[in-house]
């Protein structure tokens, strides 16, 4: 879900 911690 594109955050600095997740690219999902």
Swiss-Prot record:
Keyword Secreted: yes
The protein's role, per its UniProt record: Produces in vitro relaxation of rat arterial smooth muscle and constriction of intestinal smooth muscle. May target bradykinin receptors (BDKRB).
Keywords: Amphibian defense peptide, G-protein coupled receptor impairing toxin, Secreted, Toxin, Vasoactive, Vasodilator
GO biological process, one term: defense response
Site residues, Not sulfated: 8
Subcellular location: Secreted
GO molecular function, a single term: toxin activity
Name of the featured protein: Des-Arg1,Pro2,Pro3-[Thr6]-phyllokinin
Keyword Membrane part of the UniProt annotation: no
GO cellular component: extracellular region
Expression sites (tissue/organ): Expressed by the skin glands.
Family per similarity comment: Belongs to the bradykinin-related peptide family.
């Amino acid at each position: 879900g594109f955050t600095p911690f997740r690219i999902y």
